[in-house]
């Protein structure tokens, strides 16, 4: 998000300052696409993310007119922040982190407290999905600005030769495989998708993710890699290869169930492929109820075997929605209107 806001800034009156973790960069740049960059000597993720956010907030209070906060982990500090700064705070609360299964009870309590402080002390609250917009209104009685994510940065000119080479590398034939890409976590319904394909041997799936990062991932890989129609691949970070795989798949499977508009879903929609998504309010809002939806392996099997479904219209609708709602020039202007 920050990358694209900076890249799409066309205003001479708007100057971004971005706070970065020194731990994540070997070479520090002090200007990036016109934005000033400042470095904090703490990790931006994990337990250090909280002091990292606090240090960044203190620096921003001294140097900026408006402070844009992405995520709520550091917002527990806002009651203290307001004692010495009345700077305008725009806070994107992201997904509902306190509801995610991967956090223990105490982490969830802390994240819920931080979310509450964000909504209380923020001048403007940004939500990325109508499901979260409705949640903030019902939970806190406060309206929020609905701004999603862009996905058109994935569109690239890729030659037929480059595309053929990538497909050949992975032993794939265009439009003969389904594709899923995600972090390998239970809330992304990896098991639900793989179980369905294990029972439909005539349907091939390529599943890309960080399989070796958890016991869950290792278990999934061990259980399902033995099926001839299931190709399990490690995480791929080359955007061009990912785009070849996305643009040549038969169906795109999206199993995310946790809060908000998911960037990987938005990106996939630009490739005009049929989307089969887990049935939750966030995915239905993102796709305007025009994709196919499953909430069990059985229903997914039924979808895969149902030749009467209008997958062509599904694909056209996904592309049309993406171009109407999820272009970065639109998203950047929406944010700039809040400053």
Q: What residue spans do the PLM features occupy?
A:
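An aromatic- and histidine-rich active-site surface loop
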Residues: 48-61, 65-94, 260
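Short hydrophobic beta-strand element within catalytic cores of glycosyltransferases
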Residues: 251, 270-277, 284
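N-terminal strand-loop element at the rim of the active site
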Residues: 7-46, 131-139, 212, 216
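Donor nucleotide-sugar binding/catalytic pocket of nucleotide-sugar-dependent glycosyltransferases
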Residues: 88-91, 115-164, 172-175, 180, ...
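A charged, aromatic-enriched C-terminal amphipathic alpha-helix characteristic of glycosyltransferases
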Residues: 309-339
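Nucleotide-activated donor-binding/catalytic signature segment of Leloir-type glycosyltransferases, i.e.
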Residues: 218-239
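Membrane-proximal helix-turn-helix segments that form the acceptor-binding/catalytic region
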Residues: 58-62, 107-125
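Conserved donor-binding/catalytic core segment of Leloir-type glycosyltransferases
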Residues: 167, 171-188, 194-200, 205-208
């Amino acid at each position: 998000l920050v990358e694209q806001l900076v890249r799409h800034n066309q205003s001479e009156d708007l100057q971004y300052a971005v706070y970065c973790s020194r731990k994540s960069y070997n070479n520090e740049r002090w200007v990036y696409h016109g934005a000033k960059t400042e470095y904090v000597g703490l990790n931006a993720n994990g337990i250090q993310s909280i002091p990292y956010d606090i240090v960044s907030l203190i620096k921003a209070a001294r140097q900026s007119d408006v402070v844009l906060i992405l995520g709520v982990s550091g917002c527990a500090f806002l009651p203290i922040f307001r004692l010495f700064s009345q700077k305008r705070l725009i806070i994107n609360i992201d997904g509902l982190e306190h509801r995610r299964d991967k956090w223990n009870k105490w982490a969830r309590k802390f994240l819920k407290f931080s979310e509450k402080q964000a909504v209380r002390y923020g001048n403007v609250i940004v939500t990325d999905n109508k499901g979260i917009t409705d949640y903030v209104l019902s939970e806190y009685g406060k309206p929020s600005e609905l701004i999603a994510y862009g996905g058109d940065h994935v569109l690239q000119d890729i030659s037929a030769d480059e595309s053929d080479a990538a497909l050949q590398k992975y032993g794939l034939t265009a439009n003969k495989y389904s594709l899923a890409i995600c972090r390998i976590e239970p809330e992304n319904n990896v098991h639900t998708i793989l179980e369905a394909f294990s029972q439909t041997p005539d349907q091939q799936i390529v599943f890309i993710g960080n399989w070796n990062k958890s016991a869950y991932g290792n278990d999934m890989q061990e259980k399902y890699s033995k099926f001839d129609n299931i190709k399990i691949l490690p995480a791929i970070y080359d955007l061009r290869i990912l785009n070849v795989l996305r643009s040549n798949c038969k169906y795109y499977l999206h199993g995310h169930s946790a809060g908000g508009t998911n960037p990987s879903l938005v990106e996939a929609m630009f490739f005009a492929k049929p989307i089969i998504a887990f049935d939750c309010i966030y995915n239905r809002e993102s796709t305007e109820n025009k994709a196919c939806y499953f909430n069990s392996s059985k229903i997914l099997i039924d979808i895969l075997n149902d030749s009467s479904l209008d997958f062509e219209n599904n694909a056209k609708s996904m592309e049309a929605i993406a171009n109407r709602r999820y272009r970065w020039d639109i998203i950047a202007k929406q944010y700039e209107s809040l400053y």
